[in-house]
Amino acid sequence: MIFHMYAVILQTTYFQADMRTIDNYDVKIFTDNIEEKAIEQIRRLMSIDVFSGCKIRIMTDVHAGAGCVIGFTGNLGDRVIPNIVGVDIGCGMLVQPFECSGDIDFHELNQFILSSIPSGRDIRSQEGLIQLQPYMERYQEAKELVKELRCFRELKDVKRLYKAAGTLGGGNHFIELDRDGQGRMYVVVHTGSRNLGKQVADIYQKQAVKNMFGWDKLMEKQAGMIEEYKAAGRKAELQEAIRELHNSFRMQRPPVPAELCWLEGQPREDYLHDMRLCQRWAQINRSIITDLLVEYLRAKGNISGTQEALARERFESVHNYIGDDSIIRKGAISAREGEKCIIPMNMRDGSLICTGKGNPDWNWSAPHGAGRIMSRAQAFQQLSMEAFNDSMKGIYSETVSEQTIDESPMVYKPAEEIIANIRDSADISCVIRPVFNFKAAQ
């Protein structure tokens, strides 16, 4: 029934993408289905200097986020707000198509995931690190990336971060096996930079707040004072002079809320450097998880073909990052002309495999999913397990529970709405529907 619904939508030609604009700004919102809170977040973003004069495009799956609207795309300028990219830096989805041989034992697969791929808040034990021996080169790279962060000294529990490579996380992160209309199978892994990205985002957002209170100017004065006193041979007086400088410092009130404070100059460069390392870390994380799954299925006789052949078909779509094209994408993916991408709908209806159209009016982007219409708190309060179980009939999942009800299909916008509104951004190649789903029970 789901495939029939998609087929009807894909064949129709009269759908036009709904769109809203905001007066006096170069903003387009590619849907009419947007709550007032999200509109207010967009207006607030446009009212600050960071995005004045920027071309802002808001994707179809837009919804209000923590301080910043989800579905945001815009140009990177001389100022950057770490909170725009957010705490899950480099989060995305990796897709591995394959030809399936024989029947997959889904219960055994679920047990393998539980024993080999930590999820939720869990990380790898010492024993779990042994499972990464075939991927030790990537694991070591992930470890070095952490060490190369310019904010390294401010990180907490670094040893725990080292053990997070090859782990899934919680929330909307998942592992799926999907099937297309031709019977081809897909491993799909959705995860990001785990606690590493959160720490880096928080460190730099706090620095942005401090700098806008005037802290950076105080540090400049202090550095100048140290240089001056040393040159004059007055080192003995320096400690008292610094104390007086700090006592005389008066914080300025930032012109924006704390979550929208920005970085510029060297702090901006430091953030962008560390953000890119987190993006690479997230990419490694997805690749390790995917390879663990592929090699498990190969050992069970469910996957044939060489690693090289599989690698040629593998692709991923990242949705919380700043790309080489200097486009900020917060809950949006790159959709350059000819670029293969994936747009997930929900854990029942699966995902769209698409090819980007490279539309500059969309900032060369597409939505990263269906977009929530119900908050997690609302889902826990309003949805029943009976409805959740009914919605997942025909899909093998041992993680459909009260702990994951906030990710049930009903909390997202209807798939047909997203399909109807992305025609100018991407062509849909096929629909893949889950046959197996795993999520962490928090």
Please give the residue ranges for each predicted region.
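Short capping/connector residues at structural and topological boundaries
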Residues: 75, 94, 378-379
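Domain-length cofactor-binding catalytic modules of enzymes
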Residues: 15-44, 51-58, 64-70, 79-82, ...
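Acidic active-site catalytic centers that drive phospho-/nucleotidyl reactions
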Residues: 60-61, 88
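Short, charge-rich binding segments
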Residues: 74-79, 85-87
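Glycine-rich loop at the start of a catalytic domain that most often binds anionic cofactors/ligands
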Residues: 69-77, 99-100
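A generic, well-ordered mixed alpha/beta core segment in the N-terminal half of proteins
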Residues: 84-138
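Short, positively charged and aromatic/hydrophobic N-terminal segments
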Residues: 2-15
